Structure formats: C-alpha cells, structure tokens
Amino acid sequence: MIYQERNGNAVAVHQGENKMDIADLDFSHRMDMELSKHSFPYFFQNVLGMMYPKYMEEWLESMETTDRTVIICSRDHGKSVFMHSWVVWNLVFQEPPFQMLYISSNQKQTMVHMREIDRYFNLPQLKHLRPSRGWAIGNIALTNGNSILERSVGSQIRGLHPQEIIIDDPL
C-alpha cells in the first residue's frame, strides 16, 4: 500500500488484496492522537515514528518529577530530538494558553532548533494545528492557542511568562 497526500490528508492507495480506505487511516490517526494525550512515549514512537531507548525513559521521568532537569549526555544520543518532540507534544496537548521558550547559544542555532520543531507540524496528524496564514519560525503559534518563542543566550526575555523553558546547547 502506498500513501499519498490529497487535500492535506494522507490517503491510502490500494494495491493488491490489502485494502484500507481514508476513514480507516483517519480513525488510526485519531486513535494515535487520543492515546498520545497522556503518553509522551506513545506520541514519540507512534506519531513521530522515533525509537524510544531506555535512557530517554529516565530523562522523561526526571522531567515529570522535578521542576528543573539538566540532561548531560554525549553527542548523538538524541537530546535535541527528544526536546523537540517534548516541545511538540506539550504544544499539542497542554491546555491553552501554554507558552514555551526555546533558548540556544546563538540566534543561528536557535533557528535550527525551531525549524526542526516546525517540521513536525507537516505530519498528517499535526497539520491541522498550523494556521492557514502560516507562522514565523521564531514565533510558532498553533491554532489551539499554544505557542513557542525562540531566544538566544543573552537576548531580551524580560516580560515573557512562559510555562516552560528549554535551554538546548547554551554554550
């Protein structure tokens, strides 16, 4: 079976005897989103399609049980991917208005992170949260009323009142 995009929806194109229609696919997406509401690991694995190793379980437990979490780990363990996914999950499922702030070492690096976060909203299950007029990469505001702003280390953050701040690669 091949999936194609038509009018913003993923459509199953039938091949052979295995048939699936749009309603089945929509139902599957709705179920994935419903199960994701209360489970970041489910969202990470089943909606975003990522592997969820044991050490990420420890990161999540720390984030859910403390007010401040620092994750120190060598390169290529998925810290940024984990945090981007965490941001997306919160933006999708937190009660609005929920504002996040993403801070990195410099403007260029912060924008790299924000572009990665932006990419997730091209997934069929999340596309409806992207406003028709679009958004600025540095100020992502979803149709559900939640948003994320970017800042670099040393930039002005006075006056902002985000519910969550992510500091990724500050040095």
Give, region by region, the residue ranges found by the protein language model:
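Phosphate/NTP-binding elements of NTP-utilizing enzymes
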Residues: 2-171
